[in-house]
Amino acid sequence: MADIKNLKPEEIWRNFDALTQVPRPSGHLEKVQAFLLDFAKKAGVEAFQDPAGNIVMRKPATPGFENRKGVILQAHMDMVPQKDKDSKHNFETDPIETIIDGDWVRANRTTLGSDDGLGVATIMAVMEAKDLQHGPVEGLITRDEETGMYGANELPAGELNGDILLNLDTESWGEFVIGSAGGIDITATLDYKEVETDKEDAAVKVTLKGLKGGHSGIEINEGRANANKCMVRFVREAVAELDARLASWQGGNMRNAIPFEAEVVLTLPKENVEALNDMIADWKDELKDEFKGIENVEKIEFFAENVETPKMEVPQEIQDNLIDAIYACHDGVLRMAPSMPDIVETSSNLAIIAIGEGKASVKILARSSHDGYKEYIATMMESCFSMAGMKVEFSGSYGGWNPNPESDILEHVLKVYKEQNGVDGKVQAVHAGLECSIILSKYPHLDVVSFGPTLLSPHTQNERCQISCVAPFWNLMKQLLTEIPEK
């Protein structure tokens, strides 16, 4: 494990290193909540856990800065628990093993948690700083952002006192975000009665892995391979040409990550197994050709293993309906933003498929900066899976964050950034969900901007943070807080 505590700036890396020792996957945050409250006590700042499970810290103004506008520093405490399939890491009990790799910090075959652990570490650094001059500062560290923005959605009105919100969940240094997409979760489910398999049939487990995966918002425009969509093309052909039957399917495990692995168990006549292996080899070549220049094609693995024939499988009519619905389901970019042609407006991610033992479940995350189109793609999915006899439910809907190019804090941030770096910052809207829109719905007076150091491949086991960006990010933060204007 690399000692990232020795990296500069020490204030950020020491606190981030401490965070990596505390398990904090979404949905299992008791340890990190206790850790943050204990940290605040040792730092001598007020802190409490609100009814939503968020941690709020308050640090009074430096003497002479009491009349400055109040600043809320905001980040989320949870991380996406993604890992290589053969990794033994337990996100609920094990610390993250960090590795320094040139100008990058990464983890050992797991997500790193820099999304949004670096934001949390920055809040910690501000709260414990003794030589930093600033007005009133609050830290809002939210719960379960990655699985539905629950902490922001349940944030009590009247809890925060600040005038400015600095969100620390942007992942490209030099970009200053003033708008983001809304989103909605779509879940299709079906209970079915399994049927007995033909005892004379063989069974194979077909695995597709080695895809990049990635963030289903930020990286959806790259056209990366979705393991579920690739798998359904093969399965549909195997069913049609080789009399294969579906026993089970497992693909993807995070709603907001492009699935990079999928596996199915198929039964089929023994005499067709060799033809199935040939078909898999052909599909592997096809995927390598289709995704050349997008995926690391030499890492793509697509193979079959002989397994014991399961006793039960999916009834043929239900199997065919499920395959058709998954095949027809839209995945990827649906529309680019008319006013910002380089930005995705609307997309969907066929994130998780679980079929077997009498239950089928499909989970999709749709995103759009246009509320009408968000509802359109959700009802499109509802139509698609309803035709397969599935029950479709919507949850976790949140609106987009509408840009305000006239923002005072944006102007101030851009001025300080140029003073320090000699170049103009880039003002951006992103095709990802940020908590800003939800917080603004409860605190509409806030002036908001989002920024942070560069992270690559968040939500994947390839996640990494660029070391050289963290020092200028911290320098910007310190000067911003010192120069916040008076009320």
Give residue spans per PLM region:
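Active-site metal-coordination/substrate-binding segment of hydrolases
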Residues: 65-163, 189, 203, 316, ...
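Zn-dependent metallopeptidase/amidohydrolase metal-coordination segment
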Residues: 9-12, 338-341, 345-360, 365, ...
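Acidic/His- and Gly-rich active-site-bordering loop/insert found
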Residues: 3-103
